Structures are given as structure tokens and as C-alpha cells.
A protein has these predicted regions:
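Phosphate/oxyanion-binding loops and surfaces in catalytic or ligand/nucleic-acid-binding neighborhoods
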Residues: 10, 14, 27, 31, ...
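Hydrophobic/aromatic-rich alpha-helical bundle segments in the mid-to-C-terminal region
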Residues: 40, 44, 53-104
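Generic serine detector
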Residues: 4-6, 18-19, 31, 44-46, ...
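Short, charge-rich amphipathic segments
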Residues: 2, 24-36, 76-77, 87-94
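Amphipathic alpha-helical packing segments from all-alpha helical-bundle domains
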Residues: 11-19, 25, 29-59
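Hydrophobic alpha-helical connector segments
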Residues: 1-18, 62-69
């Protein structure tokens, strides 16, 4: 959980990482190499990592829960980018993660 919040901060607040993420989002359509990097860093790579973590934590339906967990994280990158009140979005993101984790514990 703490790691996911740190990754969100990294991909949204770090100047280099945020610019890199935005560049990959655009360039994925122009180059197979950029598409592969986009998938590796922002889509299938993180989703697979979360799934593996959930398997090791013996969370039920690790693949389904990983998709639910990471999809929310991924969408919040874009919400954050377009928000006037970025602190509010970050808080909403953290609350959403807490809620998902609580639901998975049940």
C-alpha cells in the first residue's frame, strides 16, 4: 500500500517521471519501441507486479483484484494531470486505495 502511494507520487510529482510518463503516452502510437516501454512501465508491467504481490499475499482472485487495484491507480494519473487541485486528487486516490484494500480483506 505504501509502495503504491509512493509510486503514484513518483509518476505524478517527480518532474522527470511525470514528463516521461506523458511522453510515453503520446509516443506509444508512433513507435513499437515506445509502445513496449509504455506497456512495461505503465500498463502490463505494474499490473503483473501487483498480481504477483497479491498471489504471494494469498489474496483471493489475485489477477482480478490486481486489475481493479491498478486500473484505479492508472486512471488517477490522468485525473491528477488535469486537476486544478492536485492535493485533493492525491487525497482521493489514497482514500480509494485504502477502500480497495479493505474490500479485498473481506
Amino acid at each position: 500500500m505504501k509502495y503504491s502511494k509512493s509510486m503514484f507520487e513518483y509518476w505524478t510529482e517527480d518532474d522527470f517521471a511525470s514528463s516521461f510518463r506523458k511522453m510515453l503516452t503520446i509516443e506509444q502510437f508512433r513507435s513499437e519501441e515506445m509502445q513496449n516501454l509504455y506497456q512495461q512501465y505503465l500498463v502490463s508491467g505494474p499490473a503483473e507486479y501487483v498480481k504477483d504481490l497479491f498471489k504471494n499475499m494469498e489474496i483471493k482472485n489475485p489477477e482480478e483484484n490486481a486489475v481493479k487495484f491498478y486500473a484505479n491507480m492508472f486512471i488517477y494519473y490522468s485525473v491528477y494531470d488535469g486537476a486544478a487541485d492536485k492535493a485533493k486528487v492525491k487525497c482521493q486516490f489514497e482514500q480509494m486505495l485504502d477502500k480497495i484494500v479493505e474490500e479485498m480483506k473481506q
